[in-house]
């Protein structure tokens, strides 16, 4: 029980719920939990590129590795993601998708314990190379780094982020998810609750500083090209024939 959590959200009777938990889990005994340690990954100092081939449509994806949830800057990452892409008025939405410079594009973040990730992806237009689509994505990162975005975009991104969080909080499943995530990431629940207020105070200069600090030539690019996949084949094993006694009854 010292390495698990029972997450409940909804219209519950606290006293009855506690009784049920004690009845079903009360005899669990504490055990020593070994502390997990890991070797930090080597720093990426130049772009790493790889190509995969398959029959599906072509795309390009760019990934950055960022600090984990305990880092003092990580709370800004979801806001950076929303500034770039929020389905309506992010830099990628306005400059690439609505201007039809690529067929489609997006960006998203994933905050985890040891490291977080940030990823941008695009599907090229007909006649457009994956390298051209890649450069268009990177150009939007550069706009963050130079502060080349309208002043209204940051307050709008903050309001949009808070609105989405409020709407999702109407559902028990989302509230349970937030508590589960906080438990897994070892976050103080008070910090999770105050995250929106903290995010509301982020300035444009903080966005610029964040982008310059973490978005350098330290990314990985995957080019998905159209073609016949040349995947290694597993040799088919010899199958032993099984004699069936169809006329035998037991």
Predicted segment positions?
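Short, solvent-exposed loop/turn segments at the edges of secondary structure
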Residues: 1-2, 43-46, 54-59, 74-75, ...
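M16 family metallopeptidases and their MPP-like homologs
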Residues: 3-9, 58-68, 94-200, 220-225
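Proteolytic maturation boundary segments
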Residues: 5, 13-53, 59, 94, ...
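Solvent-exposed, non-transmembrane alpha-helical starts
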Residues: 19, 70-74, 129-134, 232-233
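Short amphipathic alpha-helical signal-transduction/dimerization elements
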Residues: 25, 84-88, 138-145
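Secretory-pathway/luminal and periplasmic proteins that interact with or process carbohydrate-rich
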Residues: 27-34, 89, 163-171
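Active/ligand-binding-proximal structured segments within catalytic/core domains
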Residues: 62, 72-84, 92-94
């Amino acid at each position: 029980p010292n390495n698990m959590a029972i997450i409940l959200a909804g219209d519950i009777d606290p006293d009855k719920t506690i009784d049920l938990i004690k009845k079903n889990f009360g005899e669990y005994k504490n055990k020593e939990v070994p502390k997990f340690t890991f070797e930090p990954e080597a720093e990426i100092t130049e772009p790493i590129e790889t190509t995969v081939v398959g029959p599906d449509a072509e795309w390009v994806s760019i990934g950055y590795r960022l600090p984990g949830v305990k880092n003092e800057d990580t709370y800004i990452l979801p806001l950076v993601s929303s500034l770039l892409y929020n389905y309506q008025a992010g830099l990628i939405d306005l400059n690439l998708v609505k201007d039809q410079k690529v067929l489609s594009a997006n960006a998203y973040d994933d905050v985890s314990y040891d490291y977080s990730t940030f990823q941008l992806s695009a599907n090229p237009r007909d006649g457009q190379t994956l390298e051209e689509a890649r450069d268009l994505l990177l150009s939007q990162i550069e706009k963050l780094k130079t502060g080349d975005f309208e002043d209204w975009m940051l307050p709008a991104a903050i309001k949009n982020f808070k609105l989405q969080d409020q709407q999702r909080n109407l559902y028990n499943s989302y509230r349970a998810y937030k508590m589960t995530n906080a438990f897994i990431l070892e976050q103080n629940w008070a910090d999770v609750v105050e995250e929106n207020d903290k995010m509301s105070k982020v300035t444009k200069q903080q966005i610029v500083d964040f982008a310059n600090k973490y978005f350098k030539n330290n990314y990985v690019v995957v080019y998905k090209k159209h073609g016949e996949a040349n995947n290694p084949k597993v040799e088919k094993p010899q199958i032993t024939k099984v004699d069936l006694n169809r006329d035998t009854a037991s």
